[in-house]
């Protein structure tokens, strides 16, 4: 095996208590029962500490337990030893040194370094032409820190040698967790660091590409060595082509090519002809810049001809990222960036905002010793541990240090370079919080708002004692429904975690400019001329707030006063104000062609926000409540049978309809549920289901089978005992509420009948006098995947009511045409100035684009 051969050519380690050759076998004998060879399915962590972001690149290296295969930095390995008694660890360390200089002053050319055997990312800040890497491995025995240099094939027992070799050759643990989830995780090309690029003056235009040999205009690949544009073949893209890109490689030997039309600020499709597989190029931006391509301004289209929306987005990308402005990097505690794992910017932006809130800082980082000391044996699978790890990584300043001054670099490089790690990789955190979620566990771009609610749900489910930091977002919404004919009203309350503001397009203050721009744009498109400068709709924030507070019609409203359907209107007000108010601008909608689109608007979001006028007032004098009577719906037996039979076996779901909906930008699981609950009646019917249900808290949750009859009884024990713990399956609740019954009524009926749908319907018909149980309040969380049930008077500060006056302290912006594509960044106000967090880059903001945000975070101003 190549890695084993590389390891066995490596010199011994240094710095600990070394053993004489004759003592090694005797020393290991007591520990042999604890040393394991990794089996299939074991997760071997050799790149990242379970409690910190230490790695083999760190000064203290990384210790891998030879029993659990968990990894620990120097500050945390003793904790694991004390807790488990495991004594044998493999210590991994990567050294970075300056290359030996030749007589002319340049670095001597070297062959491929055989001393590299760890699968680690290289330091992007170091020029690989000037530095070389050397990996070191050794066994360390605790508590005396005896060191056994590797390789030591003659002295070590065979089992230990095999175990060491298996650990070093193991693959990423994230692939083993769920192969389907991480199928898009690509290897870094071995040619990326030292790729030769010819200085031949080639510059690639932004469009109009064609193959240099056959004039094809699709499936084109740019060779990153000489800039040749040639057509591909089925080997990677499954598209048509004559294989000229592959022929060019065979003629010239230039290994890497990037597919034109896939280049975005987040990356591109790169193929290695030599390695014969898709790869990652960590220096892709530099390699493309060699041919005049700026990744920050690229947006993927198949043939390079930019559509209308693509052209409009250019300005958006530049403004939000503050391109063209020399931004000053910031370092230290609270100024640590998060590396992009490939469309993980939605997660990074939300977590930066979350950990700028003192309550989250105290709950996790403030309790770090206790959380780490009492973490389970596998801390990689514990939410609170991973939240604390991430929070400490962001707030400690340990991974955000300014570069060393040039004179100090010279002194350091004479011996050994000690690289400063800037930015942390949230791979372990993302793997855990997205586990079992079909969307967040993928490498696709996601909606930051949906992830925020998903995170709130995880915080709720994993609260630390009575402390729940997500309570700062929690508030009550009062919904008032009025029968237009009788004027009688009904008041209900629900829990929410964010305020969704509609975009009041009709209130644009520059309508004349917009009309003129649209005419000019269409004329330019028709005549194939350059498009005019973008004119963005300017929407007053007050208009959006007014649209939020205006009454809305209730479809199919059944008036209990009339005992019949009638016109009804609903208004929403705040029954309580949260400590931190999250405002989402509803920029995304659907066109007449079902294609998702984004409102490209500018909204004058205020720094100071006062919404006290939206405080709920409850039942007013003179108002009369609607009778609490259920609709007298009679369902014939044959209709019940049809209802049961329309739910098909999940294995029979029409996948073609699912994919039609998914291509419109809807979450895959939502599409599957839409097709399932509409009985495979086609994409159009399923689309209507999506439109009706897309605001529901479990919209993007995986499809789970409801129980009927005996199956429901058997499944009841899975969901818990009766009472508050027995939450009925959401699918059955949705079926009953779709018939016109109240949600609370449906839940109480299902609980009374052990989640049996037929018996629940009979129960409802036999209890027309249904009254809501006063012992509990059903709260429909606006959450990505949970409905939380709490008592009417819950223990602890579940709602932190107060003044409705707020100050803006953070906002998340989205660039692109859909939440399923594009890029997110975050701006946070710290120490009196705005800071931009763009993945791993953290800089002082010069022009924070507060008018183009997607999610806004406000903190209450004490009254």
UniProtKB/Swiss-Prot annotation:
Effect the entry attributes to changing residue 273 to A: Impairs ability to stabilize SIAH2
UniProt effect for mutating residue 221 to A: Does not abolish ability to stabilize SIAH2
Zinc finger extent (UBP-type): 187-295
Chain residue numbers at which the record places covalent cross-link Glycyl lysine isopeptide (Lys-Gly) (interchain with G-Cter in SUMO2): 311, 405
Positions of post-translational Phosphoserine modification: 114
Major enzyme class: hydrolase
GO cellular component: cytosol; nucleoplasm; nucleus
Domain text: The UBP-type zinc finger has lost its ability to bind ubiquitin and USP13 is not activated by unanchored ubiquitin. Swapping with the UBP-type zinc finger from USP5 restores ability to bind unanchored ubiquitin and subsequent activation of the protein. The UBA domains mediate binding to ubiquitin.
Entry protein name: Ubiquitin carboxyl-terminal hydrolase 13
Organism: Homo sapiens
């Amino acid at each position: 095996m190549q890695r084993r051969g590389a390891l066995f050519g490596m010199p011994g380690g240094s710095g600990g208590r070394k053993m004489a050759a004759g003592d090694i076998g005797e020393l290991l004998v007591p520990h042999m029962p604890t040393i394991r060879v990794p089996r299939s399915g074991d997760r071997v962590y050799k790149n990242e500490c379970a409690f910190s972001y230490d790695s083999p690149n760190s000064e203290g290296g990384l210790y891998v337990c030879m029993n659990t295969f968990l990894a620990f930095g120097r500050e945390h390995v003793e904790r694991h030893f004390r807790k488990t008694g495991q004594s044998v660890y493999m210590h991994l360390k990567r050294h970075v040194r300056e290359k030996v200089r030749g007589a002319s002053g340049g670095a001597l050319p070297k062959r491929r370094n055989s001393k590299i055997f760890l699968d680690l990312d290289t330091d992007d800040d170091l020029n690989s032409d000037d530095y070389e890497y050397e990996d070191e491995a050794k066994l360390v025995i605790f508590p005396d820190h005896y060191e056994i240099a590797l390789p030591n094939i003659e002295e070590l027992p065979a089992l230990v040698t095999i175990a060491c070799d298996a650990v070093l050759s193991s693959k990423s643990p994230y692939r083993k967790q769920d192969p389907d989830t991480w199928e898009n995780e690509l290897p870094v090309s071995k040619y990326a660091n030292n790729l030769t690029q010819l200085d031949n003056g080639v510059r690639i235009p932004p469009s109009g590409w064609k193959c240099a040999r056959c004039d094809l205009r699709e499936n084109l690949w740019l060779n990153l060595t000489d800039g040749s544009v040639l057509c591909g073949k089925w080997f990677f893209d499954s598209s048509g082509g004559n294989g000229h890109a592959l022929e060019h490689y065979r003629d010239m030997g230039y290994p890497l090519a990037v597919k034109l039309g896939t280049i975005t600020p987040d990356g591109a499709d790169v193929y290695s002809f030599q390695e014969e597989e898709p790869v990652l190029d960590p220096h892709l931006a530099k390699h493309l810049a060699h041919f005049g391509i700026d990744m920050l301004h690229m947006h993927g289209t198949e043939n390079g001809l930019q559509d209308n929306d693509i052209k409009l987005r250019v300005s958006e990308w530049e403004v939000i990222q503050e391109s063209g402005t020399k931004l000053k990097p910031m370092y230290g505690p609270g100024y640590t960036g998060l590396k992009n794992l490939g469309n993980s910017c939605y997660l990074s932006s939300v977590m930066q905002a979350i950990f700028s809130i003192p309550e989250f800082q105290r709950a996790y980082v403030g309790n770090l010793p206790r959380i780490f000391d009492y973490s389970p044996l596998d801390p990689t699978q514990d939410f609170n541990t991973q939240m604390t790890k991430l929070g400490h990584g962001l707030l400690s300043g340990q991974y955000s240090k300014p570069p060393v001054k040039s004179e100090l670099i010279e002194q350091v490089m004479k011996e050994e370079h000690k690289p400063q790690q800037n930015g942390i990789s949230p791979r372990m955190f993302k793997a855990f919080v997205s586990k079992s979620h079909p969307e967040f566990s993928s490498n696709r771009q996601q909606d930051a708002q949906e992830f925020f609610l998903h995170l709130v749900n995880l915080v709720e489910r994993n609260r630390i004692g009575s402390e729940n930091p997500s309570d700062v977002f929690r508030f009550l919404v009062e919904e008032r429904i009025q029968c237009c004919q009788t004027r009688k009203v009904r008041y209900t309350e629900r829990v929410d975690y964010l305020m969704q503001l509609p975009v009041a397009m009709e209130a644009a203050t520059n309508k004349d400019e917009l009309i003129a721009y649209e005419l000019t744009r269409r004329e330019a498109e028709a005549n194939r001329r350059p498009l005019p400068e973008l004119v963005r709709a300017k929407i007053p924030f007050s208009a959006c707030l007014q649209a939020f507070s205006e009454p809305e019609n209730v479809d199919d409203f059944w008036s209990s006063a009339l005992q019949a359907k009638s016109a009804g209107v609903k208004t929403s007000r705040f029954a309580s104000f949260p400590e931190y108010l999250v405002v989402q601008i509803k920029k995304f909608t659907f066109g007449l062609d079902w294609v998702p689109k984004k409102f490209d608007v500018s909204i004058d979001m205020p720094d100071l926000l006062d919404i006290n006028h939206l405080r709920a007032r409850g039942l007013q004098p003179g108002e009369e409540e609607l009778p609490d009577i259920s609709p007298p719906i009679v369902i014939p037996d044959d209709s019940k049978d049809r209802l049961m039979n329309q739910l098909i076996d999940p294995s029979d779901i029409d996948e073609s309809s699912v994919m039609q909906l998914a291509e419109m930008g809807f979450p895959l699981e939502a599409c599957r549920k839409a097709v399932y609950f509409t009985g495979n009646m086609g994409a159009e019917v399923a689309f209507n289901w999506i439109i009706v249900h897309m605001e529901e808290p479990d919209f993007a949750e995986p499809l789970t089978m409801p129980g009927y009859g005996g199956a429901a009884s058997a499944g009841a024990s899975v969901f818990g005992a009766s009472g508050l713990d027995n939450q009925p399956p959401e699918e059955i609740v949705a079926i009953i509420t779709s018939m016109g019954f109240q949600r609370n009524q449906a839940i109480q009926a299902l609980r009374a009948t052990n989640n049996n749908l037929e018996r629940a319907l009979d129960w409802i018909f036999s209890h027309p006098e249904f009254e809501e149980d006063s012992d509990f309040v059903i709260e429909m969380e606006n959450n990505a995947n949970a409905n939380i049930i709490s008592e009417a008077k819950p223990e602890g500060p579940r709602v932190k009511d107060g003044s409705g006056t707020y100050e803006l302290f953070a906002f998340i912006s989205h660039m692109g045409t859909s939440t399923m594509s594009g890029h997110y960044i975050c701006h946070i106000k710290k120490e009196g100035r705005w800071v931009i967090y763009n993945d791993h880059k953290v800089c002082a903001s010069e022009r924070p684009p507060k008018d183009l945000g997607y999610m806004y975070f406000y903190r209450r101003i004490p009254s």
